[in-house]
Amino acid sequence: VVESLGTDKVIFLPDHYLANYVQKNTKVKIISWQGTCMVHEKFTGKEVEDIKKENPGIEVIAHPECPPDVISASDFAGSTSSMVKYVKENQPKKVLLVTECTMSDNVQVENPNVQFIKPCNLCPHMKKITLNKIYDCLKNETNEIKIGHNIAEMARKSVLRMAEIG
């Protein structure tokens, strides 16, 4: 995605660790925003190494928003969809997904033969979303965010282009 922009420098946000991960995989100069994901930032490389010692043969799959020591201690790092694909295609006997723990629950449903080790870091912001709240928003048409047509069109183009690139 970064290289498809046709520039030699990109301002990358919102996550500093993801920017560092992307920088290692491109020649484009990345200028990163110093934000992080509070869930991924809680994990440590030592924690991953300890889990590997306690669970011989476990495959550790990390999200690139994790700190570099976590990525280094992992067997695979990739986007959320890449993590899901990795589990589905490789069917490891035992796996640790280094990301928000609800994701492990969802992936486990689709991969019942895989044992998931879950050091649970929950995202308090994701937990604010409930089925009842979604139902109320749809039923009452509340909490709508309105943006201008021009901004919506630019955002739509960006999202479609990103999906096209992969």
Q: Model-derived features: where do they sit?
A:
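The feature marks the mature, well-folded catalytic cores of soluble enzymes
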Residues: V1-G166
